[in-house]
């Protein structure tokens, strides 16, 4: 009797689980059809479709690689012979992607709030000037994507040492990072980390010293430019 009773309970439980599974599958199917219908038939279907595609690739990697391949082809280049260098002009607020002497792409940028002059310390809100390289890539940065440059460089450290801005030993630590192709210390009075990131490049957009781009543009840089790439920042 007990065995028969248990069998009936187990059978009822199986039916209940099956019905619940069918119910959730039905609801998921209906919601999916409603979503697709909304994308297809609404006047804003183009916008919704674009947003849907973006949700599948929130950091823009696939699109960025495809678009950059087109820019390389337009410049007569392939990835095999692409030798990237980034040139940033503060006065004209633009970033140029070069391969040797060939221009591949140009992007508008935002720069530090104090727009004129060499960066002297971590609080002056200036974008540094000089020769740097990309020392780190951060895909989880609060500014969408981040390419850290190796500021402060040995030149920045030497200037800071002469002007007694940094402490004894700081210059040596910064020089050691340069020689090992790694990111320099950011705990000195020269500040950092600084780099190239997303979240906007309008003429009124200013930063604490980094270089800002529109998100679609930093995506193109981030997914196509490697660490170690040279970055020249001009007045």
Regions found by a protein language model. Give the residues of each.
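N-terminal pre-domains immediately preceding structured catalytic cores
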Residues: 8-235
